[in-house]
Amino acid sequence: MTDNVNPNVKEGWTGPGRRDGTILPMKPEDDALHIDVGAKNQFEWWYFDATLEGGYTLVAFFYAAYPNPGLDTGKIAVELTLLRPDGTKTQKVIKYKKSQFFASKEEPHVTIGSNTMKATFTEDGFSIYEIFLEDEDLMFELTYKAQVKGWMPGDGYSYFANLGYFAWVVPLPRASVTGHIRDGDKMLDVSGVGYHDHNWLDFSFQSIIEYWMWGRVYSENYSVAYAFIQCNEKVDRHAVKVLMGAKGSEIFLSSGEYEFTQEDFVYSEVAGHSYPQSITINVPGELEIKLDVAKVLEQVNMLDNFNPVLAFLAKNVLRLKPGYFRLKSDFTLKATRDQLETVETGSTSHEVVTFKQLGARE
């Protein structure tokens, strides 16, 4: 499959081509605040997740400006989601006033109400993040210790002609996670593996982007983070592709030059969208990953989160159809290093966010 490439879309790779011959080191300010909080069409958020022993998965957001379409667009907020081993979920979005928000522009330090995120850095360049989020139903108090140093594709930015920019940095491609959580009135000591990234942009998602798919793969020896972002006709359906590969703590691959194949779409009545049961990511001669969906963890028609009037306008006037999937897949990873091929397997979760119908509706 040949990529659509618009020469007016500028990606921040150091080269040659759409990859990093030199991987730029992350600095503390890369994970600090970038936008003018409250300004129109400026969005920024810090994302954390963790897969915990015992079968729990959690997700936490700190929003300087909430990016999703709806009445909360642009609001300061935090979000807590807990997926339990039995498949049940609690998800809370709590909004705050600007007077309750602080974020440094020099280092990773965010306070929203009583919710906090702060990082420290060791002499060897590995970071430690402490996060705390709480409402009446959920509480997360966690420490993330980096196992792979922070990474960004090129300088982290993609510029979409004169339409705006999108920035993505990954301060914690892979981290050990310890701490405790509260689920209702039940306290749990937890440990597991986690991830943290950070995004900011100056346009509304749906104005340029049709869909994106992203995730991570953690095997015994390798860590991979990827994103495939399909843009619309405004930029000639340009596809932004980013991928990081690390062996142990060493990042050996930072590239947008990979083949991305989606197959065997299945329609979800709940989400009103289809998702691919199989995804293959291939960097010829270097890395290949096959994802086969074993379970749908979340499937959401995002119009269900709108009030009825706004949902009608979004669907029938703006022609928006936002949907979301969190998928659990079995993976096979093949890595070639120094002419030696290694094969490792496991399971992982990955996500799909879309504003158009994917695949064929059956």
Residue ranges and their predicted role:
Residues M1-E362:
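Structured soluble/peripheral alpha/beta segments that form catalytic or ligand/cofactor-binding pockets
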